[in-house]
């Protein structure tokens, strides 16, 4: 109950419940938007004293507002050279707080990467949250109404930016990117500074993800022109691989005073847990630094599958089908014959890039989430084989780094990773903190109070440092 002289600071809980119970459909959203469009976007403080019927109108209007602007969810798709230059000019020491052993929130470089990855990143299915991606859900006005209601409960303004941020956490979770500056600090501390006498340094990233570490390796080479930085990563996602090569091509041609000549980058389209990822056994390669931040839980990320396709060409020769860059073909690729790759069956005739083939076999590259049915299984199918490969690949005196965090669906992940690494012969030398970004606002509790996300979850993730 609000007293006569009390100042109300939030929307009443009963109004939020009233919004929840009064979804009136897409047509009503359009009608309400026509009525309220001149006032959009509403700030949170403008909503506090609205009566329950008007606030329901505003919720419907905001739903149509976000629907109209849904294409903006991918952000700026133009390549931002300024963001790249800002990263290259940033001092590496700003990325780490020595007193708290924390990799701090330094977002330089993410704006540059967004032009290459944002649309694909939003199209990644979060497998343990259902089959729909963030992009899919942006077409559903009933879902967007729920987003608006959630934003009000979190006490945020109904701006496009705030609504898009909220959409990522309603009935799902979008995949995040590791900040390039934080990764660059790890490359400096455990790569450059730990090996002052080496002119050539090799880094392996077992799970590439969305290219934050790739960009940090470019930064590291730029800041250390006397060192040759060779970067190799692995990832089964065709979307990641194609974006990887787009970024590499762009950076390789980036010139002027920021030209980098002491850097090479390569990616292999397979997991870190397969025999092909034992680079020492297969290619004689050793790495001074191995580090990754993999999917945190069984089924967390579900990318479009890719396939290893073996076929017979018109001359009767056995061939393996890849695209022009040597990448395996995505399940959604439409072949010249009009059939998608995922629909091919053994013995099918098909045409690709103007050449005729007959399919002999098609093997799904697979992802860890599809290989096991429990967290224990995923530990043994993915983590342990990856650690075994890392042990084979690590140079004498090298460092292996894991950034993981306990999550609802795998509540012992941190302990499991440390245990498995120790069982395979590694020693835990240090633990750093990776400072997390925060969604503004608060979460409504059952008793009607609100708690900030910082109160509900620790504001950092551990970064485990291992040596042999």
Q: Where are the model-predicted features located?
A:
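Class I S-adenosyl-L-methionine-dependent methyltransferase catalytic core
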Residues: 1-83, 89-468
